[in-house]
């Protein structure tokens, strides 16, 4: 899978170059990396004394025009910084996991960083990825990595050995592949698309993700839907939950699979899917432990082909004592089962293999890895599901190649939309410039004619005439400023036209916009 390959390659490249120093170890921090390059000098208030602080503030403010002159031909970068099941073990991923209800706070903290304009967090059991629009690629990446290090308690140097960092079209393609299920442990699984949708819903409920990130995620959803509708990538595809059930069946004696006593802890979305796939395997009964009975009742109402027995969370260990297989899928940030718990559980019958199976699909994990040290217990987590999904690898690669055509089409549409944003300030400035002239000349004309000589209809007709003339005159220039992928005009041609109009009418939009961004960030830092 393309995204996974890129991610793994990035992590590998860092490890190989680490000994040669920071520049060699982090080529993605210094490479030009395509058309969209941007940067901004970091503006920090310095000095403890008031005079020193004031001097630093003045110096920072004076750097506006220097920074704008240096970077006015450049553009903010879209970046993704993250790790996944392909690049990092679950022990690291669980430390970085951000609960869904904390996404808004994480976004707020990220966008408060000096060089980050927009941000989004995608945190699942298999990945933790941060998408940002950075005013400066180098500084933005460094700030995000430092934020991740601070939140997880993992040194930045250790994090970089597992992180992948992708820029602009590579970052966008990666998100589209994630949404389509191409970067999932289980190719084509549907839950990741729902999780990408939740990022957008979460952003809408908390004040928005920012123009670029919001559009990118919405286009990623479109790409994910198209891949599933126009290819057979989802045919026979398994989810993390179904892979967990399959793994349990593989480890049980074949003759006893259907008679095994099944226990599920957690009745959320993942847990519900576990029940669904147990039914598909022919299981007739499952015990579900959950904090409240309402969710269990809802599952029971929907799935009538299996007997579902509810037990409260306070009876979890008693329920585990009566189970051959224990599936855990909760949002608990602490372990539910440790080695000490497993040691006091009664042994399993030899007919069932003599081993109690714990299949933990939670991140952070619910079951300690040390359980496997107990003679009659074995624990499997999400990383162990690779054993299940490695089957049919050739078919997985073929399906991924079919889906890439759709991914490329949607990527081009997004890139065309983003390219068109470069000319929007110029279009607005040109329209405003023309309208000011129109209004001024119209006022002169009306004064010459005299208000007493005009009725409302005549005045409206003259105003409409002036507006029509301006629109006709602007139509040609504005057409040459549009770059939405609908014609053969290249971005370079469009930008050349934009710069020409800026010079002719002294619009100087790019520089003004960037100066405003720098000023806003500096004032925020100084306050």
UniProtKB/Swiss-Prot annotation:
Domain of life: Eukaryota
Main localization (coarse): plastid
Disulphide connectivity of cysteines: none
Matching PROSITE patterns: GLUTR
Site residues, Important for activity: 174
Enzyme Commission number(s) of this protein: 1.2.1.70
Transit peptide boundaries: 1-43
Subcellular locations according to the entry: Plastid, Chloroplast
Keyword Oxidoreductase: yes
Binding site for NADP(+): 266-271
Binding locations of substrate: 124-127, 184, 189-191, 195
Similarity section: Belongs to the glutamyl-tRNA reductase family.
Listed HAMAP family: Glu_tRNA_reductase (MF_00087)
Protein name: Glutamyl-tRNA reductase 1, chloroplastic
Gene this chain is encoded by: HEMA1
